[in-house]
């Protein structure tokens, strides 16, 4: 497998133990997501990747948590999704399109 090229990175704020997985808008420049899983043993991180993979129609293997494995503020890298595509898909999801 060839090395992954420079990824697009995004800063997120995660709210674990929510009722359901959903985008919750922006807070202080960070995209905020609610995740239903508990923040224990990596469950919320796995569910975050699963949710974003479905939402953004991107393979799970192409999304990686770079920083913040044990905190609410995270940096994610997307290896096959451009910043423009990410922003368009997030905007559409936030506005119900």
Swiss-Prot record:
InterPro entries: DUF167, YggU-like_sf. It comes from the Bacteria. SUPFAM superfamilies: YggU-like (SSF69786). Gene3D superfamilies: YggU-like (3.30.1200.10). Belongs to the UPF0235 family. NCBIfam families: DUF167 family protein. PANTHER family: UPF0235 PROTEIN C15ORF40. This is UPF0235 protein DehaBAV1_1103. It comes from Dehalococcoides mccartyi (strain ATCC BAA-2100 / JCM 16839 / KCTC 5957 / BAV1). The lineage of its organism: Bacteria, Bacillati, Chloroflexota, Dehalococcoidia, Dehalococcoidales.
